[in-house]
Amino acid sequence: MTLWFVFALMTVAAIFAVLWPLGRSARAQNQGSEVVVYKDQLTEIERDLASGLIAAPEAEAARVEISRRLLAAAGSEPVSEPKSSLKWRRAAAVLALVGLPLVAIGVYMPLGSPRLQDFPLAQRERGSGSGMAGSLENLVVQVEQHLEKNPTDGRGWNVLAPVLERLGRFDDAVRAYRNSITYNGESPERRSDLGEAISAAAGGVVTAEAKTEFERAHALNADDPKANYFLGLAAEQDGRKDDAATIWRALLAKAPADAPWRPLVQSSLVRVGGGTMPALSDETIAASKDMSEGDRGAMVRGMVERLATRLKQNSDDVEGWLRLVRAYLVMGDRDKAVGASSDARQAVAKDTERLRQLNEGLKTLGLDG
């Protein structure tokens, strides 16, 4: 109710501001005209002459000039409008002041919906999101229409392919990646992207066709992360978990510390059991063959202790924590394994993604509590 009252006051104020000049007489507006100015100047000349500030000839010349201007200005002044015209204008102003709001209300009531509730913000945001998705699909249609007319536009295929893959149109994405390679030339990234799209179309399985593309990407760039990851995944799916672990370990060894795909590779390595114990050098393995069982156990415990010490300095190493927990379990020391898992969770508690990977790894080790 208060809001409608404020709107009404604002409407009245706006109408009043527009119509106020219609109710004023022309005489009031003429008070500041040139005639009044010249009359004041004549009076001032008489005052200066009487006080002796100017001589009589100068006063006479000024009086003649100002009188001439006064007559000219008086002849150009508009004639005051009759009172009847002023009354009509005032009546029109009052009629507009009262009539316009009534007309607005009369039009709004049958057409408007004053009781309609506000459109909730959540629904507006959902509507906006669906609108954006629809807009993206419209853009895809436009690009596809352009490529139908210009099929050799390599840049168009290069732009379209990842968008199609993101929309879940994997078969179309495969075709777009192939055309991108045809018209842009091959590169490690394009071969890897094509292999990924083929795998996605197969439900995540690295098929022989997809593996061929990853091998081509690897031949162009042996350090291509996507090619190496999927080649490791192909080895895992073929049952060659040791080969998968070897590929992924090599990938992590060369990976930057802030690589966005590093957590994915680490969790995959844990999945295939690649983080059981710290890696042994060839010399250590050869020396261990001549050790007694007790000496060999002491060597393993020393390696585990060094790993635990290293994790105190580099506490965000999820793969290292999982190796340590698994090592304790292999040694039959479940209490230390539980303690290490607790320390690990505390170390990565502020990193949501690392904590998720850690919990998944611990769950595979039977320590999901």
From Swiss-Prot:
The chain crosses the membrane at residues 7-23, 91-111. One of its GO terms (cellular component) is plasma membrane. PROSITE patterns: TPR_REGION (PS50293). Residues 112-369 are periplasmic. Its main location: membrane. Keywords: Cell inner membrane, Cell membrane, Cytochrome c-type biogenesis, Membrane, Transmembrane, Transmembrane helix. It is a multi-pass membrane protein. SMART domains: TPR. It is found in: Cell inner membrane. GO terms for biological process: cytochrome complex assembly. InterPro entries: C-type_cytochrome_biogenesis, Cyt_c_biogenesis_CcmI, TPR-like_helical_dom_sf, TPR_rpt. Gene3D superfamilies: Tetratricopeptide repeat domain. Required for the biogenesis of c-type cytochromes. Possible subunit of a heme lyase. This is Cytochrome c-type biogenesis protein CycH. The gene is cycH.
